[in-house]
């Protein structure tokens, strides 16, 4: 994604693994980051996924509105500002769950994990095969970690985030 609202993204003719698996009866979900376009037609739920809960940009794009130099004009924000964390479904429902600001970045992967686990539970209860694509935000530079992860590695914030990621996924 070049800039928010750009008309570039995954194309309708691009076949995804989710599309192929859905044709075989799988429940398909993507949770976490997705960088294949931010307009609704580019959301994973338009490309084979039953459910998507995640962010659409590299992390520093999402924290830009917190910068004191970021334009405060509402028209600018409406046209060029990043979308919030999106929860969408194959039936066309799309909800903006709020901005991915610096504070939320500390724990957003826990939100994504919880949503992925709920998806898996529902598929298991329905005795349906499933495919989950989980993309945490932790391995980005710059990342924001919660206080509890500071110093875990003894090698700086990036490696602390990696230890936090390892703890998240097991």
Residue ranges and their predicted role:
Residues 1-170:
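Formylglycine-dependent sulfatase
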């Amino acid at each position: 994604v070049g800039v928010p609202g750009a008309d570039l993204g995954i194309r309708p003719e691009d076949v995804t693994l989710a599309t192929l698996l859905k044709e075989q009866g799988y429940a398909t979900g993507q949770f976490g980051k997705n960088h294949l376009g931010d307009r609704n037609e580019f959301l994973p739920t338009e490309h084979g996924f039953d459910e998507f809960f995640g962010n659409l940009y590299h992390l520093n794009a999402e924290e830009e509105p917190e910068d004191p130099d970021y334009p405060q004009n509402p028209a600018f924000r409406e046209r060029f500002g990043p979308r919030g964390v999106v929860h969408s479904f194959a039936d066309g429902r799309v909800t903006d769950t709020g901005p991915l600001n610096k504070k939320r970045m500390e724990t957003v992967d826990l939100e994504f994990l919880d949503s992925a686990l709920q998806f898996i539970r529902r598929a298991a209860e329905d005795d349906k095969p499933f495919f989950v694509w989980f993309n945490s935000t932790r391995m980005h530079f710059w990342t924001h970690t919660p206080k509890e992860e500071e110093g875990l590695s003894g090698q700086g914030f990036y490696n602390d985030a990696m230890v936090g990621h390892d703890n998240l996924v097991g």
